[in-house]
């Protein structure tokens, strides 16, 4: 039986710089699709204020961003150069990410520069792939989609042979040192207290402060992804290989989804640990739902999502509110906000106007991001940005980049944070970060034990 993971293991060495996106719900009629994208045809990236576009004819353009040539225009111009006809054209689009750092192209936000000379990863990168393997788990169907120029010979026979191949390389994973963090527990608690002080002064109502961890390793980081997806199945499971670095994770949160003329944001605000004991978890859920601090934070972020969508939408409504959702190590409170796109509204602009998520920045959003840049000791990179798909028709589905690893130079970087309000307590906020990182740390431990 073919699964997304089993096929990915077979094709990844033959088709480097590939992407795997899985659904964790194989039995639902909706959201039961998984994808493997192979063989980059074209790409658009932004780094250092320069837009770089690569095309199927091997041509390349570089152009600086200006007041009149912004990311929205660059993305739309790139997308509009590709016209796709035929079946399954809805899966032909751009797969990639926007880092939290990309906000500097959308708002006047200072972002700490990276001092890592080896870190040449773009702030924003989306790729158009030649092949997309589509799994419909509900119908138990597998479809191979190929993008061909007129007169071009198909490469599907080679792909089909790779899928049926039973002899493929496998690799081990091991850790080569302890997990470290650029800041200590006490330093993170001091940062939390700074956030509380800004809330008390009225600079912000809420601010999300995070902390990074680093795990040195050797071997195959795909083992960590496999462990994570088994420990912590989430609505968004993904493994992107960009050559010199990988981004992979199991995100529970939709940043922005646009389909059939409606835009959706699913804010998560309110988190408690999960014990695995049904009775105890029910008690923890009831306490979370009744907690004044968590309720105030949730209301604030639902309102922020409504405001973000209202910039380009009408009929903005709350679809469901404070729904408890259960994951391996935590319980979250989740709402869904949706709006109908205004006539003539640009879908890319609608996406950009929601970025970054309020649940990863704070409220008011711009001031919160300015303070984050002052308080956190490093730029966030991928953490708190988004990752996913942008269709050539502008429809999109982007997850928030949380519960995520960035793998580079034999190091795994992972990060978590919490929403700080005036009544927050530093020790509780430290524990919330540890709760959120529980699944990631457990995945590393399990990956070491996984045999080929």
Task: Show the residue positions of the predicted features.
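Extended alpha-helical targeting/anchoring segments
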Residues: 1-452
């Amino acid at each position: 039986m073919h699964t997304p993971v089993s096929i990915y293991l077979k094709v990844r060495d033959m088709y480097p710089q590939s992407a795997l996106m899985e659904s964790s719900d194989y039995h639902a009629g909706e959201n039961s699709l998984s994808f493997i994208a192979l063989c980059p045809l074209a790409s658009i990236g932004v780094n250092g204020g320069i837009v770089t576009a690569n095309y199927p004819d091997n041509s390349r353009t570089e152009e600086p961003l200006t007041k009149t040539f912004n990311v929205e225009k660059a993305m739309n111009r790139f997308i509009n150069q590709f016209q796709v006809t035929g079946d399954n054209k809805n899966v032909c689009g751009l797969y990639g990410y926007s880092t939290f750092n990309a906000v500097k192209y959308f708002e006047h936000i200072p972002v700490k520069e990276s001092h890592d000379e080896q870190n040449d990863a773009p702030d924003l990168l989306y790729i158009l792939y030649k092949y997309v393997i589509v799994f419909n788990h509900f119908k138990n169907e597998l479809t191979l989609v190929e993008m061909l120029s007129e007169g071009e010979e198909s490469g599907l026979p080679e792909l089909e042979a790779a899928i049926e191949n039973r002899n493929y390389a496998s690799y081990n994973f091991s850790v080569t040192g302890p997990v470290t963090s650029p800041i200590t527990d006490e330093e993170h608690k001091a940062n939390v207290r700074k956030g509380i002080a800004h809330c008390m002064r009225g600079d912000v109502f809420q601010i999300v402060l995070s902390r990074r961890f680093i795990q040195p390793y050797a071997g195959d980081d795909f083992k960590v992804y496999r462990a994570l997806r088994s420990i912590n199945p989430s609505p968004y499971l993904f493994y992107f290989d960009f050559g010199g670095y990988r981004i992979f994770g199991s995100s529970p949160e939709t940043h922005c989804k646009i389909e059939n003329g409606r835009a959706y944001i699913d804010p998560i605000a309110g988190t408690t640990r999960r014990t695995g004991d049904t009775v105890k978890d029910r008690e923890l859920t009831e306490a979370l739902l009744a907690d004044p601090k968590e309720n105030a934070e949730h209301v604030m972020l639902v309102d922020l999502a409504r405001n973000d969508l209202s910039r380009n939408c009408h009929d903005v409504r709350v679809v469901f509110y404070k729904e408890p959702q259960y994951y391996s190590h935590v319980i979250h409170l989740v709402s869904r906000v949706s709006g109908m796109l205004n006539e003539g509204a640009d879908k890319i602009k609608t996406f950009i106007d929601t970025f970054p998520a309020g649940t990863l920045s704070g409220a008011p959003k711009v001031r919160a991001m300015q303070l984050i840049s002052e308080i956190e000791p490093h730029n966030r990179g991928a953490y708190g940005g988004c990752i996913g798909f942008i269709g050539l028709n502008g429809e999109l589905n982007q997850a928030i980049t949380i519960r995520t690893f960035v793998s580079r130079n034999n190091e795994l970087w992972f990060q978590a944070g919490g929403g700080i309000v005036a009544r927050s307590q530093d020790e509780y906020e430290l524990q919330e970060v540890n709760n959120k990182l529980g699944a990631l740390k457990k995945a590393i431990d399990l990956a070491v034990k996984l045999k080929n």
